Amino acid sequence: MAGMKIKKGDTVQIVTGKDRGLKGKVIRAIPDQNKVVVEGANRVTRHTRVQQSSRGSQSGGIVTQEAPIHVSNVMIVDPSDGRPTRVGYRFNDDGTKVRISRRTGAEL
């Protein structure tokens, strides 16, 4: 299985699902599951048990947070024009491997 081409900190656009068209930043990448967590997308409600912390405060209740999305449902956004693009790789003159936009050829 090939590695994921989307990394933490990338700006992506969701191409399928209930949040289709939404752009956001990747908060977390989960390579072993081929999933990413996108800021502000795929919000779910979790009911957490109230737990006593060491300082005496309580945490719990109903919490809204982002859930992971499969990488096939997101595309990286080209920084030159803000449109979604596929990702390719190229080697620079000094031998370093860089990600490029398949549409424009710009470095990501």
Curated annotation (Swiss-Prot):
Segments of this protein annotated with the region Disordered: 46-65
Keyword field contains Ribonucleoprotein: yes
Gene Ontology molecular-function annotations: rRNA binding; structural constituent of ribosome
Parts forming coiled coils: none
Any GO BP: translation
Keywords (A to Z) from UniProt: Ribonucleoprotein, Ribosomal protein, RNA-binding, rRNA-binding
Compositional bias segments (type: Low complexity): 51-61
GO cellular component: ribonucleoprotein complex; ribosome
One Pfam family in the UniProt entry: ribosomal_L24
Stored InterPro entries: KOW (IPR005824), Rib_uL2_dom2 (IPR014722), Ribosomal_uL24 (IPR003256), Ribosomal_uL24_CS (IPR005825), Ribosomal_uL24_KOW (IPR041988), Translation_prot_SH3-like_sf (IPR008991)
Family membership: Belongs to the universal ribosomal protein uL24 family.
Record text on subunit structure and interactions: Part of the 50S ribosomal subunit.
Function, in words: One of two assembly initiator proteins, it binds directly to the 5'-end of the 23S rRNA, where it nucleates assembly of the 50S subunit.
HAMAP family: Ribosomal_uL24_B
Protein name: Large ribosomal subunit protein uL24
Gene: rplX
